[in-house]
UniProtKB/Swiss-Prot annotation:
Keyword Isomerase: no
Organism listed in the record: Caenorhabditis elegans
Name recorded for this polypeptide: RNA-binding protein rnp-1
One cellular-component annotation, GO: nuclear speck
Database matches in Pfam families: RRM_1
Keyword terms: Metal-binding, RNA-binding, Zinc, Zinc-finger
Disulfide-bond pairs as recorded: none
Zinc finger boundaries on the chain: CCHC-type: 84-97
Length: 305
């Protein structure tokens, strides 16, 4: 049967290998447990008295060690006896003690059932249908949840505008969540006024200010509509119906009019503005109208050059 020896008054620099070398010439050492200035040496010999006699007065680093048989304060003899610690009986051990109330609680199949008190003496637990809390308040405030922690502000200047929109979204979420819970509570109590504001009133929602030079972002929904041409109202002018009405000086026989079949665009002569009639051409047109008898229109101010 293995035994254990107590070794006291050890120096501070003693390790398990050095202590094991002291006992190996006299016995077979299995383990050494050093605790500050004392240790426990486990050996395989049953008779430890000769070993204690030989090592009495042994000196390690100038200190005389104290060696004796290790015993427990509760058990004078080493080893675990076959005695019940509950009823002090030698016929059985503690797990099989009949005085243990948990050993008598068995089911029909002979399986032992263990019961644990999880309340720790705090009292009787409330049931799910406990009417202490009002049902309306339970509905209104039962849906509250912990808002996730806020993300720290990044140091990158390109992310500042997006981070401000993130903070604004968090503020809006908390505001509308509290408003919804208050409305639900008001509806449960039968209140007609409520806590919500009417649609015509304005609610000051916090708006994040963009830093200088950054792009302003918006979290509000924007409705997009296809681009449609503007509607022009009809005009009751005498010349609105005529589609081939031209100015009196817009002649197709002008020397500067380009042909329709030209493969390239017309080139305006250098020094002369485009779509401008000369004075000679304008006088020829007036004479032609007087000869044919057509009424002469009010001429536009000529551009002379």
């Amino acid at each position: 049967m293995p035994s254990k020896l107590f070794v006291g008054n050890l120096p501070d620099n003693v390790d398990s290998n050095k202590l094991k070398q002291v006992f190996q010439p006299f016995c077979k050492v299995t383990e050494c447990d050093i605790v500050k200035n004392y240790a426990f040496v486990h050996i395989e010999e049953d008779d430890v008295d000769p070993i204690i006699t030989r090592l009495t007065g042994y000196t390690i680093d100038g200190k005389v060690v104290n060696i004796k048989k290790s015993t427990s304060k509760l058990r004078p003899t080493p080893g675990m006896p076959n005695r019940c610690f509950r009823c002090q009986s030698d016929e059985h051990r503690t797990p099989q003690c009949p005085q243990d109330p948990t050993n008598n609680q068995k089911t029909e199949n002979g399986v032992q059932t263990l019961k644990f008190d999880l309340t720790s003496g705090a009292g009787v637990k409330r049931s799910a249908g406990d009417p202490i809390i009002d049902s309306a308040k339970r509905i209104a405030y039962g849906a509250q949840s912990v808002v996730e922690p806020e993300i720290p502000q990044p140091m990158d200047p390109d992310l500042q505008a997006l981070y401000q929109e993130y903070q604004l979204s968090r503020q809006r979420y908390v505001y509308y969540r509290d408003r919804l819970l208050k409305e639900m509570e008001a509806k449960q109590h039968g209140s007609t006024a409520g806590f919500a504001l009417s649609s015509s009133s304005t609610v000051p929602v916090p708006v994040a200010s963009a830093p200088p030079g950054a792009t302003q972002l918006s979290a509000a929904p924007v409705s997009y509509q296809p681009n449609a041409p503007p509607v022009i109202a009809s005009i009751n002018a005498p010349y609105a119906v005529a589609s081939n009405l031209r100015a009196p000086y817009a002649l197709q026989s002008a020397p500067y009019a380009s042909a329709a079949s030209a493969p390239y665009g017309s080139v305006t002569p250098a020094g002369a503005p485009s779509n401008v009639m000369t004075t000679q051409q304008y006088l020829q047109q007036i004479q032609h109208q007087q000869a044919t008898g057509s009424p002469a229109p009010v001429p536009a101010p000529p551009r002379l050059y």
